[in-house]
Amino acid sequence: MEPVDPNLEPWNHPGSQPKTACNQCYCKKCSYHCLVCFLTKA
């Protein structure tokens, strides 16, 4: 694992960015797309 900057929020860590953009779909797959999706959709 690469070293992580503790000052960065977890979803800003390198390598944690989802490969696809967030969308407005509320299905289970899209709700678990990333932490931001999970917090706003779940």
Swiss-Prot record:
Answer whether the UniProt record assigns the keyword Phosphoprotein to this protein. yes
Region ranges (Interaction with human CREBBP): 1-24
Q: Which InterPro entries match?
A: IV_Tat, Tat_dom_sf
N6-acetyllysine-modified residues are where? 28
Q: Which GO terms describe its biological process?
A: positive regulation of viral transcription; symbiont-mediated perturbation of host chromatin organization; symbiont-mediated suppression of host innate immune response; symbiont-mediated suppression of host translation initiation; symbiont-mediated suppression of host type I interferon-mediated signaling pathway
* Gene Ontology terms: cellular component: extracellular region; host cell cytoplasm; host cell nucleolus
The molecular function terms in GO held by this entry are:
metal ion binding; protein serine/threonine phosphatase inhibitor activity; RNA binding; RNA-binding transcription regulator activity
> What does the UniProt record tell us about how this protein is modified after translation?
Phosphorylated by EIF2AK2 on serine and threonine residues adjacent to the basic region important for TAR RNA binding and function. Phosphorylation of Tat by EIF2AK2 is dependent on the prior activation of EIF2AK2 by dsRNA. Asymmetrical arginine methylation by host PRMT6 seems to diminish the transactivation capacity of Tat and affects the interaction with host CCNT1.
Q: Where is this region: Cysteine-rich?
A: 22-37
The UniProt keywords, alphabetically, are: Acetylation, Activator, AIDS, Apoptosis, Host cytoplasm, Host nucleus, Host-virus interaction, Inhibition of host innate immune response by virus, Inhibition of host interferon signaling pathway by virus, Interferon antiviral system evasion, Metal-binding, Methylation, Modulation of host chromatin by virus, Modulation of host PP1 activity by virus, Phosphoprotein, RNA-binding, Secreted, Transcription, Transcription regulation, Ubl conjugation, Viral immunoevasion, Zinc
Q: Where in the cell is it found?
A: Host nucleus, Host nucleolus; Host cytoplasm; Secreted
Q: Where is this site: Essential for Tat's translocation through the endosomal membrane?
A: 11
Q: How does it assemble?
A: Interacts with host CCNT1. Associates with the P-TEFb complex composed at least of Tat, P-TEFb (CDK9 and CCNT1), TAR RNA, RNA Pol II. Recruits the HATs CREBBP, TAF1/TFIID, EP300, PCAF and GCN5L2. Interacts with host KAT5/Tip60; this interaction targets the latter to degradation. Interacts with the host deacetylase SIRT1. Interacts with host capping enzyme RNGTT; this interaction stimulates RNGTT. Binds to host KDR, and to the host integrins ITGAV/ITGB3 and ITGA5/ITGB1. Interacts with host KPNB1/importin beta-1 without previous binding to KPNA1/importin alpha-1. Interacts with EIF2AK2.
Similarity remark: Belongs to the lentiviruses Tat family.
Q: State any further remark.
A: HIV-1 lineages are divided in three main groups, M (for Major), O (for Outlier), and N (for New, or Non-M, Non-O). The vast majority of strains found worldwide belong to the group M. Group O seems to be endemic to and largely confined to Cameroon and neighboring countries in West Central Africa, where these viruses represent a small minority of HIV-1 strains. The group N is represented by a limited number of isolates from Cameroonian persons. The group M is further subdivided in 9 clades or subtypes (A to D, F to H, J and K). This truncated variant has a premature stop codon. It may have arose as a consequence of tissue culture passaging.
Instruction: Say what the protein does.
Output: Transcriptional activator that increases RNA Pol II processivity, thereby increasing the level of full-length viral transcripts. Recognizes a hairpin structure at the 5'-LTR of the nascent viral mRNAs referred to as the transactivation responsive RNA element (TAR) and recruits the cyclin T1-CDK9 complex (P-TEFb complex) that will in turn hyperphosphorylate the RNA polymerase II to allow efficient elongation. The CDK9 component of P-TEFb and other Tat-activated kinases hyperphosphorylate the C-terminus of RNA Pol II that becomes stabilized and much more processive.
Quoted from the entry, the domain comment is: The transactivation domain mediates the interaction with CCNT1, GCN5L2, and MDM2. The Arg-rich RNA-binding region binds the TAR RNA. This region also mediates the nuclear localization through direct binding to KPNB1 and is involved in Tat's transfer across cell membranes (protein transduction). The same region is required for the interaction with EP300, PCAF, EIF2AK2 and KDR.
The protein's name = Protein Tat
Q: Which organism is it from?
A: Human immunodeficiency virus type 1 group M subtype C (isolate ETH2220)
